[in-house]
Regions:
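Intrinsically disordered, low-complexity sequence elements enriched in Ser/Thr/Gly/Pro
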Residues: 1-4, 28, 77, 125
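A transmembrane-helix-recognition feature enriched in membrane-embedded lipid enzymes
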Residues: 21-87, 138-139
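Soluble catalytic domains of membrane acyltransferases
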Residues: 80-160
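Terminal signal-anchor or tail-anchor transmembrane helices
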Residues: 2-25
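Arginine residue identity/basic-tract feature
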Residues: 3, 24-30, 62-63, 72, ...
């Protein structure tokens, strides 16, 4: 098993290096490299969320801060990758009163801008299938996310 893991790691590292070198000339290679880095950033942010979720679950009322930490860490990791600056107008209002933010995830940009503006003590509402996505699902369960069954209207309304 150890040799298999070592072999896969070596192939992965060499492939990543070749893709990095090729990305200087090829737009397609640059796209694949950025996609891989985006997935790594998401996994890293979710892993941070799992650790923070475990720690903050020991402190009553602090569990919802995990969403803030993960959202901001994802924004921190992704911003230099895509070179996009997000300016939030009226950000001071998010600190004073409740708000609803909607991201329909038509692109990865939604996650980036939500990561920039996500307030402290917030929860995430998501479809129940996300519970089983590695890293992401564990972080979401630990952070107190509300999972809805989109196929059952009554259940979705009850969750809200």
């Amino acid at each position: 098993m150890g040799k298999l893991v070592h072999g896969v790691s070596t192939v992965g590292a060499v492939s990543f290096l070749l893709l990095t070198l090729a990305s200087r000339r090829s737009q397609r290679a640059r796209f694949y490299l950025n996609s891989i880095l985006c997935v790594i950033s998401m996994a890293l942010s979710s892993s941070i969320g799992v650790v923070c979720g475990l720690v903050l679950s020991l402190f009553p009322g602090k569990r919802f801060n995990v969403n803030y930490i993960v959202a901001r860490s994802f924004h921190f990791f992704m911003k230099p990758l895509i070179g996009m600056y997000v300016e939030v107008e009226g950000e001071e209002h998010l600190k004073r009163r409740p708000a609803i933010m909607v991201g329909n995830h038509q692109s990865s940009i939604d996650t980036l801008y939500l990561g920039r503006m996500f307030p402290v003590n917030s929860i995430i509402m998501a479809k129940k299938e996300l519970k089983w996505v590695p890293f992401l699902g564990q972080f979401m369960m630990l952070s107190g996310s509300a999972f809805i069954d989109r196929k059952s209207r009554a259940s979705a309304i009850k969750t809200m």
